[in-house]
Amino acid sequence: MKTKLTQKQIRFQALLLFFITFFLAELCAVFLYQNQLKEAKLKADYTAQTTIGRVKSQLNHYLAESNLMKHMIEAGYTVDDEEFSVLSSLMQDDQNVIKAHELAKDGIVTLIYPMSGNEAALGLNMLEHPARKQEARLAKESGEYTIAGPFELQQGDIGALLFDPIYTTDANGDQTFWGFSILVLDWESFLNEIELDTLEEAGYTYELWKISPATGEHLSLIHISEPT
């Protein structure tokens, strides 16, 4: 009788030990999974913030190029064709993201560098052009730079336009809209510079989007939902 009772106790203890071990193993697995998930989220957040920072850094770099001409005009300096060409040539970047630099007095493109290959944009009224007017008008009204596109450029290829509004100030301190300093950006080169492909290579899904100034709608520019 004692032997049978001892065997039952052993079986019970073995079964109890099994369930305890199984429970602890499951608990450890859940703990490890949660830690891995937390690390993955932190890594994804860091990667996203790094990418956002890279985009902002690139845009600030391009804006600095545009601001040189902007500040000269705001200071009352009249830029002639030769000076515009010389200064604009210094703005061209090694990565060929900046395809052209334009000045648009009263919103109408009057100066372009380089002119070769960009003749089709000369005389274009940015405040009235169907595909450009929303961002151009927003820049004029807000006093802040806006980016239009990507779309097919007048010159061909796909690009985006950075509108940097220029205002002159009279003796009374009143500001008057002068026009725009415009950078024509090569879209593919811009994407290469901000290295979005690294997100896809790392297995992330992502979307690059903007708010339509005309409708306020969410407009998707790039959407990767199935990374390779």
Residue ranges and their predicted role:
Residues M1-L5:
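Short, Lys/Arg-rich, polar N-terminal cytosolic tail immediately upstream
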Residues Q7-Q9, Q13, Q34-Q36, Q49, ...:
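Residue-identity detector for glutamine
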Residues I10, A14-V79:
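Juxtamembrane extracytoplasmic/periplasmic/luminal helical "stalk" adjacent to the first N-terminal
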Residues K41, D45, A75-L221, S225:
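Intrinsically disordered, low-complexity polar/acidic regions
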